[in-house]
Design a protein with these regions (language model features):
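C-terminal accessory module of base-excision DNA glycosylases/AP lyases that mediates lesion recognition
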Residues: 72-81, 87-146
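Alpha-helix N-cap/helix-initiation sites
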Residues: 1, 19, 40, 87-90
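Alpha-helical ds-nucleic-acid-binding substructure associated with the helix-hairpin-helix region
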Residues: 12-81
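Residue-level marker of structural boundaries
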Residues: 9, 35, 98-99
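Amphipathic alpha-helical interaction segments
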Residues: 2, 45-49, 92, 96
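Short helix-capping/linker segments at secondary-structure and domain boundaries
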Residues: 1, 54-60, 101-105
Length: 146
């Protein structure tokens, strides 16, 4: 997948400009190698939809999603309202914000899982370890139900 710096192939990373960009132009940028996602078509649409919500609801400033949240429940609701954010992504982003970026809202620490999550991953090595652990857990679950 492409990194944010590689997405600069557009020449900008501004939510308003991305939201307003012709979808075909944005899709072409998302498909350039390395692609943004293994499904660049659906991800291009999701990114543009997300940018449109950030512009409409947060003035184009994504950090307002968490800086203006009043507590953990409000943060979860704000994240869950974003296009493409299901329950798992909401939990992951909340862990990331709390553990890696120091966001500290009432009730947030109590929502943190005791086990490692994707939101705890900081390096490629940690990602490989995390993914191996997930694969092993899935294999054990399949074996137990067989």
């Amino acid at each position: 997948m492409a990194s944010l710096s590689e997405l600069a192939r557009l020449g900008f990373l501004d939510p308003q400009r991305i939201a307003e960009l012709d979808p075909d132009v944005f899709l072409a940028a998302c498909r350039e190698q390395p692609a943004v996602h293994r499904f660049p078509g659906s991800m291009a649409t999701r990114i543009q939809d997300l940018c449109a919500v950030l512009v409409r609801d947060y003035g184009g400033d994504g950090s307002r999603v968490w800086t203006e949240a009043t507590d953990a429940a409000d943060l979860a609701a704000r994240l869950g309202a974003l296009p493409g954010f299901g329950e798992m992504k909401v939990r992951t982003v909340m862990v990331l914000l709390h553990r890696q970026y120091g966001v500290d809202l009432p009730g947030l620490a109590e929502r943190m899982p005791a086990h490692q999550t994707l939101g705890d991953v900081r390096t490629a090595e940690e990602l490989a370890t995390y993914q191996a652990g997930k694969r092993a857990a899935k294999a054990a679950k399949r074996a137990a139900s067989a």
